[in-house]
A protein has these predicted regions:
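ATP-binding N-terminal substructure of ATP-dependent carboxylate-amine bond-forming enzymes
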Residues: 1-88
């Protein structure tokens, strides 16, 4: 199973009916653990990049239901991929 980081605005502010990012996350979670990266928490230390993150699971797109758990600081170098999503 892959470990994928998602760097994005707070998910509570995302419009689930219009934003394709949540649909992408919903499909990715079948094959990967999704880590939601807190944008303002990224820092660099001893050749490693760290950030606060939490596990994210999209439960329902229609009902805008999601679960965030296991808040912790992680080494971003350990992720298989990081998806950057930013509103224009």
């Amino acid at each position: 199973m892959y470990n994928i980081g998602i760097y994005m605005d707070p998910i509570s502010q995302v419009d689930f009916s219009k934003d394709s990012t949540v649909a992408i996350i919903k499909n990715l979670q079948r094959m990967a653990k999704i880590k939601l990266i807190i944008p303002d928490s990224i820092d660099y230390d001893s050749n490693n990049i760290f950030a606060s993150s939490c596990d994210l699971e999209i439960v329902s797109l229609r009902q805008k239901k999601y679960v965030q758990k296991n808040n912790k600081r992680i080494n971003l170098n350990k992720l298989d991929c990081i998806f950057f999503r930013k509103d224009p």
